[in-house]
Amino acid sequence: MFIISFEGIDGSGKTTISKIIYEKLLIEIGSNKKIILTSEPFSQEIIKLIEEIGWKDPISLALLFTADRAYHLNLLFKQNPEIIIMDRYIDSTIAYQSSLGIDENWIRNLNKYFPEPDLTILLDLKPETAIARIKNKVDKFNFDEKISTLSKVREKYLELAKRNNKIRIVNAEKSIDEIVEETWSIVYSFLNHF
C-alpha cells in the first residue's frame, strides 16, 4: 500500500490537485489497482467540534485531528487499498498545531502508530495568494484565516520539507495546468519506481 499525501496551507489547491491526480491515476493505472481518494478531517462529528473550538485550544485540536485520523484510517484499511491519495494527513497536524505553540515531538508521538506517507506533495504558495483564494471558497470550513497564521504554518511546512526527502515542493502560484503537470510528473515517477 502506498500513501500519497497532499499538504499545504489553506487555499493552496490540495483538494483540486489531489482530485485531478486521483482521476489521472485511475485512467493511467486502470481499475486493476484499488485507488482511494480521501481527505482529513473525515468525521462530520469531529469537524463540528473542530469548527466550534477554532484556534482557541490547539491541544484539543491536535487530539481531535488524531482521533479523526485513527477512525478514518481504520475504515480505509478495511478496504485493502493499494494506493491512498490523502488531502491532508499527519504533516497538516504538525504544521498547524506546532505553529500554535504545541511541541512537534508531542504531536509526532500522538501520530506514531499511523503509517507515514510514501510521498508528500507540498503545494506551496504565499499566504496573500492563499487568503485571496480562501475568500472565493464557500464550500470548505476554515478558521479565522490570517496572513500571520498562514505564514507560520507555511514556514513549518517548508521546514518539514527540508528534513524529509519524501516531501516534494510544488509551486502552487502557477496555473492549475502547470501545477498538475509538475505534480503528475512527480507522482508518476514515484509509482514507476515501485
From Swiss-Prot:
Q: Which Gene3D superfamilies match?
A: P-loop containing nucleotide triphosphate hydrolases
Reactions this protein catalyses: dTMP + ATP = dTDP + ADP
Supply the InterPro entries for this chain. P-loop_NTPase, Thymidylate_kin-like_dom, Thymidylate_kin_CS, Thymidylate_kinase
Please give the coiled-coil regions recorded for this protein: none
One Gene Ontology cellular component annotation held by this UniProt entry? cytoplasm
Report if keyword Mitochondrion is assigned.
no
Transferase found in the keyword field: yes
Q: Name one GO biological process term.
A: dUDP biosynthetic process
Q: Which GO terms describe its molecular function?
A: ATP binding; dTMP kinase activity
Q: Which domain of life is it from?
A: Archaea
PROSITE patterns xrefs: THYMIDYLATE_KINASE
User: Which residues are listed for ATP binding in this entry?
Assistant: G8, I9, D10, G11, S12, G13, K14, T15
Q: Where is the signal peptide?
A: none
Q: What is its EC number?
A: 2.7.4.9
The top EC class is transferase
Report keywords, A-Z: ATP-binding, Kinase, Nucleotide biosynthesis, Nucleotide-binding, Transferase
- NCBIfam families with a match to the protein in the record: DTMP_kinase (TIGR00041)
Q: Which PANTHER family match?
A: THYMIDYLATE KINASE, UMP-CMP KINASE 2, MITOCHONDRIAL
Which family is annotated? Belongs to the thymidylate kinase family.
Kindly provide the name given to this protein in its UniProt entry. Answer: Probable thymidylate kinase
Q: Which organism is it from?
A: Sulfolobus acidocaldarius (strain ATCC 33909 / DSM 639 / JCM 8929 / NBRC 15157 / NCIMB 11770)
Gene for this protein?
Answer: tmk
